[in-house]
Amino acid sequence: MSDEIPAGIAMEPIFVIEATYAPDAAETRPRHRPTHLARIAALRAAGVVLEAGAFPDLSSSLLLVRAVDADAALAVARDDVYLREGVWVEARVRPFVRVARPDEIPGPADHPPGAAAR
């Protein structure tokens, strides 16, 4: 078994944030959702958030984030209206290695502030 990465494949170190919803999130989320979604869209456009979404049962949300370290990744959640207003009660961050095409991973000049280098 080889550790060699096949041609056309790149490995990008990123972070996964899992944010746990409060028990009353079904009631509190709607009033904050437009602000939350606008921010996520802006972070996606900036290349900081790669993917984001919630589990249908509102147990938690997942975000895939480019950041220089775990603290910077966690700041993405800390700065979100959902965590500030109690829609999320906790956010955890874990390092993750994403399999991607080389052209999907920005070079050093393309990195948004606080984003991880490859």
Predicted regions and their residues:
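Conserved, structured core segments of small domains
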Residues: 2-118
